[in-house]
């Protein structure tokens, strides 16, 4: 999910979020809006999932959005979405990270019969996308949930959690809209409350972690999620500093990080706060845990012939996607058998050779695409098929 602002972020922020880039757009985002059920009247909270659908009054900050690898996403997902009808009728696409709706707009425009379900944990993002997609209101349902709430959302909407959709799209990474809102506390280049919650309604903030976790837990978070080699040193400094006064702002934490990280490392390793801020953001929002649950849930929800596309922007996310996809395309039939045992063959086939990267033309058009790693799969029938190149009887 990526949102563009009409002005550039300071370079230190770009060092921390290399996928946050800004490209002029001539798109008219429209004046209508989809209505979030529960905004101005009580709504059922079945399983904690709030459903958004229907018209409402516009309320929109003028953020713009250039979707990453949009054409490639369309190429990969179109065969699954047009299996029933060429215009996408009877097909359902789940955009699990709808953000500002750039990818969703592209699919809804090109496939005028397509039904789209958009998920996002950030109420601000849903405010933006409901305006952008207003002209498609009869074909769009927005759901306020993390992407690991996909199965629950589908169930509550009447689709079911198994083999009920034709496509799933995940555009991982940080929204530059969130970065630009200083009060959210994501950008270390701006002094703001030490928050970092993608969903402001969530209980845990970065300040809670910094001020209450013990030294070992802090070091583990910084090392595991930020791959910070000075994790123990930073954690020890945090414990000493907070004994005098709790941390409340990003500037206070940045100042400590400048002191904790050796000068030589500061000169060569980019901004000293980038790894710590990444680690805290991931921990606050349980980004990796959510992803580990969300990808298998999306794959289970795909009907036979359905497809999933995932775009990751940093190695921790991509490793998770790579492992889940590798397991899905592997056969569970013993290698010495000449045929696949029923129910033991690969459940999916890969549509990409490893991870695809943006080409030079795409990066030139949209610099935010530079770090992207795209992977895609298609769901298969589980049948007994001849083994290729292995097993008994091989000559």
From Swiss-Prot:
Pfam families named among the record's database cross-references: Methyltransf_5 (PF01795)
Q: Keyword S-adenosyl-L-methionine, does the record have it?
A: yes
Provide the gene name from the record: rsmH
Q: Transmembrane region positions?
A: none
Q: Which organism is it from?
A: Mycobacterium marinum (strain ATCC BAA-535 / M)
Cite the HAMAP family for this sequence. Answer: 16SrRNA_methyltr_H
**So what EC number does this one have?**
2.1.1.199
Localization (cell): Cytoplasm
**Entry binding sites for S-adenosyl-L-methionine:** 101-103, 120, 147, 171, 178
> Under which main EC class is this enzyme filed?
transferase
Record's catalysed reaction(s): cytidine(1402) in 16S rRNA + S-adenosyl-L-methionine = N(4)-methylcytidine(1402) in 16S rRNA + S-adenosyl-L-homocysteine + H(+)
Q: Which domain of life is it from?
A: Bacteria
Q: Which family does it belong to?
A: Belongs to the methyltransferase superfamily. RsmH family.
Q: What does this protein do?
A: Specifically methylates the N4 position of cytidine in position 1402 (C1402) of 16S rRNA.
The molecular function terms in GO held by this entry are: rRNA (cytosine-N4-)-methyltransferase activity
Q: Which GO terms describe its biological process?
A: rRNA base methylation
GO CC terms in record: cytoplasm
* Keywords assigned: Cytoplasm, Methyltransferase, rRNA processing, S-adenosyl-L-methionine, Transferase
This chain belongs to the protein called Ribosomal RNA small subunit methyltransferase H
């Amino acid at each position: 999910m990526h949102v563009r602002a009409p002005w550039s972020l300071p370079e230190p922020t770009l060092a921390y979020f290399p996928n946050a880039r800004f490209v002029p757009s001539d798109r008219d985002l429209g004046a209508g809006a989809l209505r979030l059920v529960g905004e101005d009247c009580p709504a059922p909270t079945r399983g904690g999932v709030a459903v958004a659908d229907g018209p409402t009054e516009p309320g929109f900050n003028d953020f713009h959005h250039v979707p990453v690898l949009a054409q490639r996403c369309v190429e990969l997902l179109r065969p699954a979405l047009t299996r029933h009808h060429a215009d996408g009728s009877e097909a359902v696409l789940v955009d699990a990270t709808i953000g500002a709706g750039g990818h969703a707009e592209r699919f809804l425009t090109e496939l005028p019969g397509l039904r789209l379900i958009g998920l996002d944990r950030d109420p601000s993002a849903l405010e933006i996308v409901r305006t952008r997609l207003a002209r498609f209101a009869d074909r769009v349902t927005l759901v306020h949930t993390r992407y690991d709430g996909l199965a629950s959302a589908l169930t509550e909407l009447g689709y079911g959690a198994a083999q009920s959709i034709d496509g799933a799209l995940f555009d991982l990474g940080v929204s530059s809209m969130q970065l630009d809102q200083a009060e959210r506390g994501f950008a270390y280049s701006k002094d703001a409350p030490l928050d970092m919650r993608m969903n402001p309604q969530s209980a845990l903030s970065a300040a809670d972690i910094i001020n209450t976790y013990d030294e070992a837990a802090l070091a583990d978070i910084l090392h595991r999620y930020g791959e910070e080699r000075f994790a123990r040193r930073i954690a020890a400094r945090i414990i000493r500093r907070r004994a005098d006064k709790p941390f409340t702002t990003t500037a206070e934490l940045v100042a400590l990080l400048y002191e904790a990280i050796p000068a030589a490392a500061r000169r060569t390793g980019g901004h000293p706060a980038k790894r710590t801020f990444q680690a805290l953001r991931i921990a606050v929002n349980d980004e990796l845990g959510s992803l580990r649950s969300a990808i298998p849930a999306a794959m289970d929800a795909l009907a036979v012939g359905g497809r999933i596309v995932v775009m990751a922007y940093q190695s921790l996310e991509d490793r998770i996607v790579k492992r889940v996809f590798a397991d899905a395309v592997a056969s569970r039939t013993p290698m010495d058998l000449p045929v696949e045992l029923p129910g033991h063959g690969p459940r999916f086939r890969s549509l990409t050779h490893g991870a695809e990267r943006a080409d030079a033309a795409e990066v030139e058009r949209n610099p935010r695409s530079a770090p992207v790693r795209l992977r895609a799969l298609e769901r298969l029938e589980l049948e007994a098929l001849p083994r290729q190149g292995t097993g008994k009887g091989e000559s």
